[in-house]
Regions:
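N-terminal catalytic or cofactor-binding beta/alpha core of small enzyme domains
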Residues: 1-170, 175-248, 252-300
């Protein structure tokens, strides 16, 4: 058993550790949570079905083989419409809240303008989640109970991996609605299956993006890079290639594995999960090769 750092034992998180971490890879799923607090549902102006459309449903299941391959897997249990862990902590719309606000707020981002800050203002349909303004105390409560435990744990996993192997690759796992799968294409009739986000090459070494793209394309899937999703807070915070810390975001078209209208798994979900298992094996090999510490030069 590896001596992993002491990790927060928190009901908001599902952290699955391998018996022995054998590769410098960590997998994270920030948006697959579906534990809706009853008080949140009472506040909501939209039905649960509308809130669930924001979930990256079943993504944690697709990547569930990670621990058996020697990789830690972290998944949020809280839903994205409650707290978005792929946002800055104070990336918020001040107009949502009643009462004193923390300073400074980062309220000028395109994501906040779209209603999709750390505490989202709108559901996936564009409908307002809340009937009116909500107490500003909500901000610190949700940071303390969800956002901070998630990122404290993720940071510990990444740093443990770095200290053990001399480098770390974080795979940030997501899914996208099929309606978004043509947004980055010239031909709107051409569906994209996978979008790889490396923050326009700033979040990971090109070898990682290329390896994932080759893997998916070899299996007949259509792949784009950084369009329409280049990555969010996670790629920006954890992607530091110059410091041997790399992050690659993977967006999967939900139509490949689920019935979006019914919010149910398709019969083919197991087949697709096995494909993802193969991808993780390939990325593990690539990480070992790319992050191999340089050997000292022999003395002359």
């Amino acid at each position: 058993m590896d001596f992993f750092p002491v990790l927060p034992d928190h009901e908001a998180l599902d952290c699955r550790l391998p018996a022995h971490q054998t590769v410098p890879v960590v997998v994270a799923s920030p948006h697959s949570g579906s534990n809706y607090p009853p008080a949140f549902l009472e506040q909501a102006a939209v039905p649960l079905a509308a809130l669930r459309r924001a979930e990256d449903a079943f993504v944690d299941e697709l990547f569930a083989a990670a621990p058996s391959l020697g990789m830690p897997l972290l998944a949020a249990r809280f839903p994205r419409s409650y707290v978005d862990a792929n946002r800055e902590p104070y990336e918020l719309d001040p107009g949502m809240f009643e009462g004193p606000l923390p300073r400074p707020l980062n309220h000028r981002t395109t994501r906040v303008a779209a209603g999709l800050g750390m505490i989202p203002r709108v559901a996936a349909s564009g409908e307002a989640i809340y009937r009116g303004r909500v107490p500003s105390e909500m901000i610190e409560h949700r940071l303390e109970t969800c956002w901070r435990p998630y990122h404290q744990t993720l940071s510990l996993l990444v740093e443990h991996t770095y200290s053990s192997f001399g480098g770390a690759l974080l795979i940030d796992a997501h899914s996208m609605p099929s309606s978004a799968s043509t947004l980055g294409t010239r031909d709107r009739d051409q569906r994209v299956d996978i979008v790889l986000g490396d923050n326009q090459g700033e979040a990971c070494a090109p070898e990682f993006t290329a390896a994932a793209e080759r893997w998916f394309r070899a299996r007949g899937l259509r792949v784009l890079r950084n369009q329409p999703y280049a990555g969010g807070f996670t790629t920006q915070r954890y992607g530091r290639p110059a410091l041997a810390r790399h992050t690659l975001q993977i967006e999967i078209n939900r139509a490949l594995y689920m019935d979006e209208a019914r919010h149910e798994r398709l019969p083919t979900v197991g087949v697709f999960a096995r494909l993802i298992t193969g991808l993780l094996e390939e990325m593990g090999r690539q990480a070992q090769e790319t992050l191999q510490p340089p050997r000292p030069l022999a003395a002359e």
